Amino acid sequence: MTNQTVPPLFPHRHLLGIKGLSPLDILCLLDLADQEIAVSRQPEKKKSVLRGRTQINLFFEASTRTQSSFELAGKRLGADVMNMSVGNSSVKKGETLIDTAMTLNAMQPDILVIRHASAGAAALLAQKVGCSVVNAGDGAHEHPTQALLDALTIRRAKGGIENLIVAICGDVLHSRVARSNILLLNALGARVRVVAPSTLLPSGMADMSVEVFNSMEEGLKDADVVMMLRLQRERMAGSFVPSVREYFRFYGLDKEKLKVAKPDALVMHPGPMNRGVEIASDVADGPQSVIQQQVEMGVAVRMAVMEALLDPRRNPSNGEAA
């Protein structure tokens, strides 16, 4: 009888985006993340699965929340974690991303976590190094671990994702979070809506299998999940909204607008929040908010991603697939 090779649960070498992942890949990561939550909640928050492995966090954009989450995730798995301070690095002296990648690659890391302002930076890095690469956000392109943690939060609260109405509201144009969430939620069978002023909607939304609304009252009607997005004024070269006050009046989530969603609708925000701009404080801190749960799920998801990419018991080839 011929022995059959059991395929790895997660056959990818890198996590560069949600695009390219199958529903089975996504569920594999969510199921593993469910197990990681228990590790984070026990007194001894430590596994040895990545003992002896090296993780380098390479953040070209400031991010207290995401960088801290990746650092904590690596340490809880037993990895040696190095945070590279780009502000004090050779990058500030004119070194290119590829030069930096080649230098780091020579140090033989096992995984590089990168955040960069340019779309495609993570994919470029993955072509130049011999280790796994995780995209922690590249321009307005993708933020895969944010979409995964959002999905985990929804699934744990609602019991599943299929057929849920999820309204993604706000600055969709500049949001890598929106793009990754749309891809993931569609893959798992949710009904996705985007709600934004026309000036903050990217072209091609109709091709992403979403319903588009310019009115919060219409877009939030009977929604199971309301996902607010940060107004990214630092990425805006021109005047996309008349004023912050006007934006909150029409697109900020307050109790009155939330009433048109389902009574048990979840309120989400990827952070950092601009209170009084995208969301009212009494909603952000209210009983329907799962914003703090999202933060907790972030550590679990990032643990799952790195364990899936690096643990030979889960990925014996350490990912020959892209």
Curated annotation (Swiss-Prot):
It comes from the Bacteria. Pathway: Pyrimidine metabolism; UMP biosynthesis via de novo pathway; (S)-dihydroorotate from bicarbonate: step 2/3. Keywords: Pyrimidine biosynthesis, Transferase. Carbamoyl phosphate binds at residues 65-66, 115, 143, 146, 271-272. SUPFAM superfamilies: Aspartate/ornithine carbamoyltransferase. Its EC number is 2.1.3.2. It catalyses: carbamoyl phosphate + L-aspartate = N-carbamoyl-L-aspartate + phosphate + H(+). It is an enzyme of class 2 (transferase). One of its GO terms (cellular component) is cytosol. Belongs to the aspartate/ornithine carbamoyltransferase superfamily. ATCase family. Catalyzes the condensation of carbamoyl phosphate and aspartate to form carbamoyl aspartate and inorganic phosphate, the committed step in the de novo pyrimidine nucleotide biosynthesis pathway. This is Aspartate carbamoyltransferase catalytic subunit. It comes from Brucella anthropi (strain ATCC 49188 / DSM 6882 / CCUG 24695 / JCM 21032 / LMG 3331 / NBRC 15819 / NCTC 12168 / Alc 37) (Ochrobactrum anthropi). The lineage of its organism: Bacteria, Pseudomonadati, Pseudomonadota, Alphaproteobacteria, Hyphomicrobiales. The gene is pyrB.
